[in-house]
């Protein structure tokens, strides 16, 4: 099973990805984790990513795409994976489609986790991170909306929307149902 998870910061993608990974025995692939591991291992891609992250910039798609592709080539991803935080743009979705085509596979499901904006703001404020002021959070949500909205159309044939309000178990029940399991 090959699954893409979409949703704004605070929607619970990481939590749901972890549960899907445990239930179906497929790896959760998070771009944040890929950045951290490549940086800590001192890989060429990690060094490139670090320059952008240290400057407070987004890592360019070219670097992110190469990291994801290398991760998809690892043996544990052969039977399936969950992508959490990738793709974020149509360009990245096109790159993923090319990776799939090269491997003779397709994405089985794209799940969009929806949560009302005010709920997201409260969830993110509740994390207690120093850099999570309400203004910064609202800006992150706007950036997400603007850059990711075109993906909803891109994936319209495989997209399923999940109501991500409720307990972790309630949302996972909806997620499992959407995956047909």
Curated annotation (Swiss-Prot):
It holds the Pfam family ADK. Its EC number is 2.7.4.3. GO terms for biological process: AMP salvage. It is found in: Cytoplasm. GO terms for molecular function: adenylate kinase activity; ATP binding. Keywords: ATP-binding, Cytoplasm, Kinase, Nucleotide biosynthesis, Nucleotide-binding, Transferase. InterPro entries: Adenylat/UMP-CMP_kin, Adenylat_kinase_CS, P-loop_NTPase. ATP binds at residues 10-15, 127, 166. Residues 30-59 are annotated as: NMP. It is an enzyme of class 2 (transferase). It catalyses: AMP + ATP = 2 ADP. Residues 126-132 are annotated as: LID. PANTHER family: NUCLEOTIDE KINASE (PTHR23359). Consists of three domains, a large central CORE domain and two small peripheral domains, NMPbind and LID, which undergo movements during catalysis. The LID domain closes over the site of phosphoryl transfer upon ATP binding. Assembling and dissambling the active center during each catalytic cycle provides an effective means to prevent ATP hydrolysis. Catalyzes the reversible transfer of the terminal phosphate group between ATP and AMP. Plays an important role in cellular energy homeostasis and in adenine nucleotide metabolism. Belongs to the adenylate kinase family. This is Adenylate kinase.
């Amino acid at each position: 099973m090959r699954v893409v998870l979409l949703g704004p910061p605070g929607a619970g993608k990481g939590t749901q990805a972890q549960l899907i990974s445990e239930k179906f025995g497929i790896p959760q692939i998070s771009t944040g984790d890929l950045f951290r591991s490549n940086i800590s291992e001192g890989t060429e891609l990690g060094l490139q990513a670090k320059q952008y992250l240290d400057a407070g910039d987004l890592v360019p798609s070219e670097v992110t795409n190469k990291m994801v592709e290398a991760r998809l080539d690892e043996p544990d991803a052969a039977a399936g994976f969950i992508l959490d935080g990738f793709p974020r743009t149509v360009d990245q979705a096109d790159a993923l489609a090319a990776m799939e085509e090269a491997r003779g596979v397709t994405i089985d499901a794209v799940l969009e986790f929806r949560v009302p904006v005010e709920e997201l703001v409260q969830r993110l404020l509740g994390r207690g991170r120093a850099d999570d002021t309400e203004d910064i959070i609202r800006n992150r949500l706007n950036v997400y909306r603007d850059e990711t909205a075109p993906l909803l159309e891109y994936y319209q044939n495989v997209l399923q929307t999940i109501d991500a309000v409720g307990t972790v178990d309630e949302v996972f029940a909806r997620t499992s149902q959407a995956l047909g399991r």
